[in-house]
Each structure stands twice: as structure tokens, then as C-alpha cells.
Amino acid sequence: MREKLKVYLVTGRYDFSDTEFLKRIETACRSGVTLVQLREKEVSTRRFYELAVKVKVVTDAYQIPLIINDRVDICLAVDAAGVHIGDDELPVALVRKLVGSTKIVGVSAKTVARGVEAENEGADYLGVGAIFPTTTKDSPLTSLQTLSEIAAAVTIPVVAIGGIKEENIEQLMGTGVAGVSLVSEIMLAEQITEKVQGLMRVTERMLEARK
């Protein structure tokens, strides 16, 4: 599980056409991202499903896990690798019961208590943040100290989320994270291949420092 979380792409639609959206995801997959999370907050269930089907064709071609944000029904409908849920979604234990033992269940956590609870209820990994300022998440920032405390309190992998950029990844050294989750840094990159390769290099340096 830990290796799959190294450079974790969360999709952002922005103003892209479907063709451009899928092209950017495909380029990111080809360039080395290790996991893709499809995040759609403002579309109908049918539209989300149709996008998920198309994205899964891409991720399957590169043998990269596809995680669905929030929607257990969409995860099951397209047979995605798993689902990621936030604080205000279904209880983790119920999600685990619904998706079964073989699906990946990721959970957002901002406190040690939430992280420990999520692990006890069946989570496979935690997303912790926002660590740095971001327009994607409007919640208060999570400190590097809290990130470290959560990572130390659980046995499942932890991913840093929120405002992650190539130039600030090294600040995560020593926090115990397994990887980084990025949206605009990849989706809006002018040269996605070069960006992903750069992210992979700096992330691997950051991870090496913990050994």
C-alpha cells in the first residue's frame, strides 16, 4: 500500500473538456503517478459515473489504482480500487462493510484521535491536511507537528495533502508520511511529464531521509 501512495494525483476539472481532462490524467499516469483519485463535487451521479468509467480505462491501462472521492456507490459501480472519505461522510466501519475487505479505504484525518479511530474501523491509509495553503481545501491548516503525530500514532500509511508543490515537499522530511497528494500542481502543469518526474525525484529524496 505504501508504494502506491508516493505521488498521488487527485483530479481537478477546472475548465478542461473531457478530452483534455482525460489526456492530462493519461499523461500523468504514463509519467509516473502512483495512484489517481477521481474527485467530482458538483456533477450529477450519472455524470460522475460516466467520467469514472472513462478514467478507469486510463488507470487500468497503466495498472494504477483508481480511488473514488466520497462516493461508495460510484466506487462499486465501476469496480474502482477503492474510495476516499472525508470527515462528514459515512462512518469508516460502514464503508468498509459496504465495499468489502479487498477495496482500499482512505480517510481524511486532521487529528490523532480521528486517525486512530479510522485505522481501528478499517481504513487502509490516511490523508492529512491541508498542510500548506490551498484553494482546493478551505479548512484550517494542519501543522507539520500534527502531521508527524498522526503518522506516529497509526500503523497505516499517511499521505500529506493540501498545497503540496515540488518546492515544499522537502519540508515533509521527518514527518513519517508515505507520500504526497497533489491536484493543481499536476493538473495545471504546462509540462505534466516533466512535473511528475520532478515530483517523483523530490518525493523519493524526502522518503529516503526517513530511513
Swiss-Prot record:
Pfam families: TMP-TENI. The keyword Kinase does not apply. GO terms for molecular function: magnesium ion binding; thiamine-phosphate diphosphorylase activity. It is an enzyme of class 2 (transferase). InterPro entries: Aldolase_TIM, ThiamineP_synth_sf, ThiamineP_synth_TenI, TMP_synthase. Keywords: Magnesium, Metal-binding, Thiamine biosynthesis, Transferase. 4-amino-2-methyl-5-(diphosphooxymethyl)pyrimidine binds at residues 37-41, 69, 108, 137. GO terms for biological process: thiamine biosynthetic process; thiamine diphosphate biosynthetic process. 2-[(2R,5Z)-2-carboxy-4-methylthiazol-5(2H)-ylidene]ethyl phosphate binds at residues 134-136, 163, 183-184. Binds 1 Mg(2+) ion per subunit. Its EC number is 2.5.1.3. Transmembrane segments: none annotated. It comes from the Bacteria. Mg(2+) binds at residues 70, 89. Its cofactor is Mg(2+). It catalyses: 2-[(2R,5Z)-2-carboxy-4-methylthiazol-5(2H)-ylidene]ethyl phosphate + 4-amino-2-methyl-5-(diphosphooxymethyl)pyrimidine + 2 H(+) = thiamine phosphate + CO2 + diphosphate; 2-(2-carboxy-4-methylthiazol-5-yl)ethyl phosphate + 4-amino-2-methyl-5-(diphosphooxymethyl)pyrimidine + 2 H(+) = thiamine phosphate + CO2 + diphosphate; 4-methyl-5-(2-phosphooxyethyl)-thiazole + 4-amino-2-methyl-5-(diphosphooxymethyl)pyrimidine + H(+) = thiamine phosphate + diphosphate. Condenses 4-methyl-5-(beta-hydroxyethyl)thiazole monophosphate (THZ-P) and 2-methyl-4-amino-5-hydroxymethyl pyrimidine pyrophosphate (HMP-PP) to form thiamine monophosphate (TMP). NCBIfam families: thiE. This is Thiamine-phosphate synthase. It comes from Enterococcus faecalis (strain ATCC 700802 / V583). The gene is thiE.
